[in-house]
A protein has these predicted regions:
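ABC ATPase nucleotide-binding domains
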Residues: 81-84, 88, 92-235
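Helix-to-loop junction immediately C-terminal to a conserved catalytic motif
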Residues: 50
Length: 365
């Protein structure tokens, strides 16, 4: 069941289209991640949904209730939309205790004092902060402040929760912990959530679906697996993961792509829907984990192309190499026990790839 409908929303700042004729749906109980680079319109879109930005055109409905319609002249105020919002900087009142911060929306709604206390206690228990209700924001860690902001956003039992990069100010370990905590709470309460982030790992870890935004538009939607395995455009292929994007042409028979600038390099690929595209240019995305490296003294790989290791970065769980084959640079992710030196010549074997055509469309493979 669809919870939120966004139809043809546009938001302008002068001549700049921050959101450009965007349409999007959110399902009941779903966590949808809006993933994109800085300046692509992610936060502006949240502002339009929450009512703190006014679009120039389009329509937004939540649970069957129209929140905004340019055509009908409808603009429901933010406080009447039943939407919770967690901002990037948390926006906690520094002169209020945790209890007072969480209770503030209830106080504004004139909820009786006794009922307020019960609701605040329940919501702080939800984020495991009930024992710190008497503290002030500056007495809390970043993760605790984030949980207070989340508790406050949930205190009015919203129909929709919006998260605007709330984890970006946390250190890496705490960020991973909070990803799990937010997801656990979302699933426990069956919340409908839109989570904005520029962090692809965060989107992959938390979301049921991902919508990739670029220049004010959603250019691809799908599950994390679909987005990662089948990018539809060169931008998605380069933004999600660390793909190497190569240009090539389909060889006779269609089982390989001949890469421009590397005479011996053939990338294996299945192209059943591109039989008519022989000798026409195609873009190929190759993920680092889909390339194997072999030492030159390994006999069974003599027929493979060779390259020179130009760079290596130790990542702990793996080593990220850059290798050069003729004029082509390819990234390779290898096990830390597979050690190759910069300047060493190696065999390499791309095991699979994703093909993106000139129009930005990619076949499902």
């Amino acid at each position: 069941m669809e919870k939120l409908h966004i139809r043809n929303i546009s938001k302008l700042y002068g001549s700049i289209k921050a959101v450009d004729n965007l349409s999007l749906d959110l399902h009941e109980g779903e966590l949808l991640a809006i993933l994109g680079p800085s300046g692509c319109g992610k936060s502006t879109l949240l502002g339009c949904i929450a009512g703190i930005e006014t679009p120039e055109k389009g329509e937004i409905t939540l649970g069957g209730r129209c929140l905004f319609s340019a055509e009908k002249g409808i603009q429901v105020p933010p406080e009447h939309r039943k939407i919770g919002f967690v901002f990037q900087n948390y926006a906690l009142w520094p002169h209020m205790t945790v209890n007072e911060n969480v209770a503030y929306p209830l106080k504004m709604a004139k909820v009786p004092s006794k009922e307020r206390l019960e609701i605040v206690e329940h919501n702080l228990n939800l984020v495991e902060l009930c024992a710190k209700g008497h503290r002030y924001p500056h007495e809390l860690s970043g993760g605790e402040q984030q949980r207070v902001a989340l508790s406050r956003a949930l205190v009015m039992n919203p129909d929709l929760l919006l998260l605007d990069e709330p984890l970006s100010n946390l250190d890496a370990r705490l960020r991973e912990t909070m990803q799990l905590e937010i997801r656990k709470i979302q699933q426990k309460l069956n919340l409908s959530v839109i989570h904005v982030t520029h962090d692809q790992a965060e989107a992959m870890a938390m979301a049921d679906r991902i919508a990739v935004m670029y220049q004010g538009s959603v250019i691809q939607k799908g599950t994390p697996h679909e987005i990662y395995e089948n990018p539809k455009t060169q931008f998605v292929a380069s933004f999600v993961g660390t793909n190497t994007i190569l240009t090539g042409t389909r060889t006779h028979g269609g089982e390989h792509i001949r890469i421009a600038g590397a005479a011996r390099l053939r990338i294996p690929v299945a192209l059943p829907s591109y039989k008519e595209r022989e000798n026409q240019p195609l873009l190929v995305a190759v993920r680092p984990e889909d390339v194997a490296l072999y030492a030159m003294n390994e006999g069974p790989v003599r027929d493979l192309p060779t390259a020179v290791v130009s760079n290596k970065v130790y990542k702990g769980a793996h080593i990220l190499y850059e290798i050069i084959c003729d004029q082509v640079i390819i990234r390779v992710q290898a096990h830390p026990t597979d050690r190759f030196a910069v300047g060493e010549r190696v065999y390499f074997h791309p095991t699979k790839s994703v093909v993106i055509d000139e129009n930005g469309n990619a076949p499902l493979m």
